[in-house]
Amino acid sequence: AGEDIGAPCRVAGIEMDLAVEHLRTMAVEVPQVEGKSPYGTVAAIFPYDAPAVMLARVGGAAILGGNRFRFSFSSQTPRTARLMAEVVAPFPEFEAVVGMDNHHFGEQCVRDPLVRVLFISGGGEVGAVYAREAHAFDKLFFAGPSGLPPVILFRDAPLKEAVPFVVRRAFLNGGQYCTTLKRAYIHRDIFAEARKLILAQMAEIRVGDPGDPLTWIGPIRVERTRALLDRALAALDGAKFLVPYRREGEWQGPFLVETPEPPDLELFGPFLALTPAASDGEAVTRVLQSRYPFLVSFFGAPPPGTKEKFQETFGMVYDNPDFLFTPLRLPFGGRGESGWILEQRDGQTVKRDGAFNYSAELVRN
């Protein structure tokens, strides 16, 4: 992962540990599939980030449900692809497709009547292309852009717990997960103290050799990610950069900015915007306007009815979270432009969105 995309070795190691532990404990999900039948072949095109986690989450659920699992890799991760193909080679239910362009792999899945379920990810244009082919599958899953996932620090937020989460979740793996934070709306009464603590916490966020266990941000080797960073930084208006950063080819960030209004764009990479909010209600209102309602986190007590509004609007809602890596058994998925499922029911294509459980989705009721 370090050689392919610049992922820090510590992060890649934790991903592997999470994946292995998830697969070892799949027995807890047996009730989700008991008495149900498999679809046949489940296929997936892995993104460049966290392929081991994808293999465990999607592949583990597919196999548990009695399906065959066929998967391909991002062109950005050739070394990872070869290694993972070797790992699954002894298990005939897993079929790793190495060296095939993802466009051709996707076309092959559309034409193959054995492939009943397909997982894809990418920008909205990718989702639109496959949506036109939804009739070829029983289910089509699309993980779209997560945009700039927000976190709110309400007026009574416990800063001792909130600040480490905000900083580490923003810059984990160089901000190259769809679940990494990009915007923090902070009540103005605690903004100065929160900013002070965030700046102190930033001392641990190092840019450097991915082989160094202290590195948080390795080289950003994916050109598209760097282009998204450039676009977001160019869109900033009235922003103040709070820490020194790098913009030298593959070496990027960390970009910690204070701004009255972060750009609402698709973004990957080491970026976090701090924005003061006049009240808890204002922070909620601004977050609810997100273009990509993928994930929202908050600390402190929200105004009455807020959590319900978040659950209606966003795919995932984290209430005073206490983890660094997202637990793999939490339901996963966005809403609106950030993700959907197209399913064939009684001859009709039905669209739905929101977080889902993989094992429950990969068997027929």
Predicted segments — roles?
Residues E21, A134, R169-T179, T215-W216, ...:
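C-terminal segments
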Residues V30-E161, A277:
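Rossmann-like NAD(P) dinucleotide-binding subdomain of oxidoreductase/dehydrogenase enzymes
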Residues P90, V126-T259, D319:
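ALDH superfamily catalytic-core signature
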Residues V110-L114, R155-L159, I220, F255, ...:
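Short, surface-exposed amphipathic charged segments that create phosphate/polyanion-binding patches used
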Residues A1-E34, Y39, A61, E204:
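N-terminal Rossmann-like NAD(P)+-binding subdomain of aldehyde/semialdehyde dehydrogenases
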Residues T215, E248-G253, D264-L272, Q289-L295:
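Conserved glycine-rich beta-strand-loop-beta hairpin in the small C-terminal domain of fold type I
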Residues G106-E107, G281-T285:
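Short hydrophobic/charged patches on amphipathic alpha-helices used for structural packing
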Residues A1, G66, L118, H187, ...:
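Residue-level signal for inorganic ion chemistry
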